[in-house]
């Protein structure tokens, strides 16, 4: 659900996300807010847990390395922009000449002009606040320690300040994006395990936690999870979502409505994950068992992808892992998820 007042407060105007969580900022032409025809130019994501591992518990060193990686990320993003400088409208007529991007350029017009001054966003992403805190401080769970919560928030604020500076320097609408990490959760962790070995609380699970989200194994109620995550969207207003995991609550819709009402004044964008799986062999409807090898009907054991329907929200959007399986890291993360009600 999109909570109107919070979307306006956090992003500057009301709009729906692009994809699962990418939000544009406010942009006006001739005094009128424009949303249609705008776009994001791409994302470069930072592996925060790796930086924390390399810092070896030294917070000052962590921020020194982080600033080095930020400079590299900016260079990569500016390279994306540079590739557009001499691109002509004729390379994609539907986008640039027929109105899909809100303009009707001539064939030999440069397209770069329509991405400037905040019309298009370009984003810095990040992954693994949970593992970063574990690697850097070794002081318990971030949820249970107010000091660690503040450390996590401060890291994201540092990233947010960086993109604000880039925007002031370049005129392009740099934004901070809480990377969905459907693939990066597996890839970054796998690369770090290969280089640094298995580290408790960091690389030992086979995946990194999605952006700023609470550890999927932490058993809390949906209200407390909202309170934990609500500090991040205002900092990462180029991309965000908060969500809760629920059992089948068709007979207790008032409870779900109560959570939605609670979310309204706290977060801009909230997802409700409830089981809607179905077995075409025995007729079972509910929640399939998630294993390292896939999803299985709890009633008859059926796991034939052609005879089941499985739906999961992963990284902000709904997918069908029976038809398009997750990578090993994301499958493990989904398997470890606990219910918040």
Predicted regions and their residues:
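Glycine-centered flexibility sites
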Residues: 125-128, 238, 316, 329
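Long insertion/accessory domains within large nucleic-acid-processing enzymes
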Residues: 301-341
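Contiguous, well-ordered alpha-helical segments that form the cores/surfaces of helical PPI scaffolds
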Residues: 122-135, 157, 313
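Conserved catalytic cores of very large enzyme subunits
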Residues: 1-118, 139, 145-299, 303, ...
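Short loop/turn segments at secondary-structure transitions that flank enzyme active sites
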Residues: 49-54, 130, 135, 182, ...
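Generic structural signal for hydrophobic core residues of well-folded globular domains
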Residues: 132-137, 248, 263, 314-318
């Amino acid at each position: 659900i999109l909570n109107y007042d919070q979307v306006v407060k956090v992003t500057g105007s009301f709009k729906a996300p692009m994809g699962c969580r990418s939000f544009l900022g406010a942009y006006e032409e001739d005094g009128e807010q424009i949303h249609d025809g705008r776009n994001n130019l791409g994302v470069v994501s930072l592996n925060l847990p790796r930086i924390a591992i390399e810092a070896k518990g030294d917070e000052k060193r962590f921020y020194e390395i982080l600033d080095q990686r930020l400079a590299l990320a900016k260079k990569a993003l500016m390279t994306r922009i540079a590739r557009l400088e001499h691109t002509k409208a004729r390379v994609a007529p539907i986008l640039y000449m027929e109105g899909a991007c809100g303009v009707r350029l001539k064939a030999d017009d440069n397209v770069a002009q329509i991405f400037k001054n905040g019309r298009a966003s370009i984003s810095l992403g990040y992954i693994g606040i949970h593992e970063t805190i574990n690697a850097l401080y070794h002081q318990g769970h971030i949820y249970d320690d107010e000091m660690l919560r503040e450390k996590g928030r401060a890291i994201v604020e540092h990233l947010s300040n960086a993109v604000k500076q880039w925007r002031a320097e370049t005129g392009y609408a740099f934004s901070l994006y809480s990377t969905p990490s459907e693939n990066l959760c597996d890839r970054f962790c796998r690369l770090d395990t290969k280089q640094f070995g298995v580290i408790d609380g960091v690389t030992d699970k086979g995946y990194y936690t999605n952006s700023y989200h609470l550890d999927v194994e932490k058993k809390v109620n949906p209200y407390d999870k909202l309170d934990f995550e609500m500090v991040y969207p205002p900092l990462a207003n180029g991309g965000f979502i908060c969500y809760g995991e629920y059992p089948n609550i068709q007979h207790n819709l008032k409870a779900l409505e109560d959570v939605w009402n609670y979310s309204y004044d706290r977060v801009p964008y909230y997802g409700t994950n409830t089981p809607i799986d179905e077995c075409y062999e025995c007729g079972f409807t509910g929640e399939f068992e998630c294993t390292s090898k896939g999803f299985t009907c709890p009633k008859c054991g059926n796991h034939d992808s052609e005879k089941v329907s499985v739906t999961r929200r992963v990284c902000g959007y709904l997918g069908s892992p029976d038809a398009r399986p997750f990578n090993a890291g994301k499958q493990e993360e989904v398997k470890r998820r606990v219910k918040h009600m």
